[in-house]
Amino acid sequence: MAAMWRAAARQLVDRAVGSRAAHTSAGSKKIVGVFYQAGEYADKNPNFVGCVEGALGIRDWLESKGHHYIVTDDKEGFNSELEKHIEDMHVLITTPFHPAYVTAEKIKKAKTPELLLTAGIGSDHIDLPAAAAAGLTVARVTGSNTVSVAEDELMRILILLRNFLPGYQQVVKGEWNVAGIAHRAYDLEGKTVGTVGAGRYGRLLLQRLKPFNCNLLYHDRLQINPELEKEIGAKFEEDLDAMLPKCDVVVINTPLTEKTRGMFNKEKIAKMKKGVIIVNNARGAIMDTQAVADACSSGHIAGYGGDVWFPQPAPKDHPWRYMPNHAMTPHISGTTIDAQLRYAAGVKDMLDRYFKGEEFPVENYIVKEGELASQYK
């Protein structure tokens, strides 16, 4: 995988925005990593590298090059470990699963930052306009967890359609009531599934749905290549509001931007078919939290599943914890062991390029030379 990323690189163009762009200078760099704490699970798997204890598996490599690597899960508040190091760090690495929120205030406070890396996909934890204005480079490991997320989406579709969770709960409680499950269990075959967004995640999901003989629809800014569209058997829907009433299942695969924040509000949900299944592994803030909870309670949404919340971590009183017929988990879909190894390798590759003054694979850039990537504008 690293070889593929290297093959995509170009030589560095000497057009950086000021001294804070990702052009490294000689000498030791201070790198701060913010990851989730593994605790008792840290030693359960030698490939568990996405946690504080695993530190992406790059500590020895970084320290052998003379760099200072600080890893923590303590990211909130003025007295946090992150706050102590933010002024003189050069690189911040964080993940969507335990994000360090990089606000305009933090960017202003930091005196030496050059590079903000996401170990995984996503950037909504970073104030991108502020990062661009400060001349920072922001990058992610594109493609590192797309398979993981698409598989998880398919799993949640099946869990909700087949009414699996009440059956599992019956077993745990020592109960046995077939009717209590069967009265709202359905096959996936023949259902109409629509994805809102058909980028890397959406396309992989559509490909995995094809063997189930579903009617596949997708809405996106851009139409998929006609040959691939024909191969998958998916139909392009230019008008989202026209697509939603057709769908038995709606899957959210669009990034969180100012345009998509709160996109699925009460009015948008009302356009969907009564009894719709919704799966959202994109970002929680794309949904109106209370509107989703209310629609689940009324039965307009027959089941809602996903691993993304707003805010994260979800507070104990978050309404999605208690709404009926949900298949929610913490933010886990993109941090399988396989995904961790991919995004750890991607981070190492970009750090290596950064130290050498080389460019990253073009698809990894979120902010470069003061400009946001097109999908974030």
Swiss-Prot record:
Function: Catalyzes the NAD(+)-dependent oxidation of formate to carbon dioxide. Involved in the cell stress response.
Catalytic activity entry: formate + NAD(+) = CO2 + NADH
GO CC annotations on file: chloroplast; mitochondrion
Record keywords: Mitochondrion, NAD, Oxidoreductase, Transit peptide
Record-listed NAD(+) binding positions: 146, 220, 255-259, 281, 307, 331-334
UniProt similarity note: Belongs to the D-isomer specific 2-hydroxyacid dehydrogenase family. FDH subfamily.
Record's protein name: Formate dehydrogenase, mitochondrial
Organism annotation: Hordeum vulgare
Quaternary structure and interacting proteins, as annotated: Homodimer.
Superkingdom: Eukaryota
Keyword check for DNA-binding: no
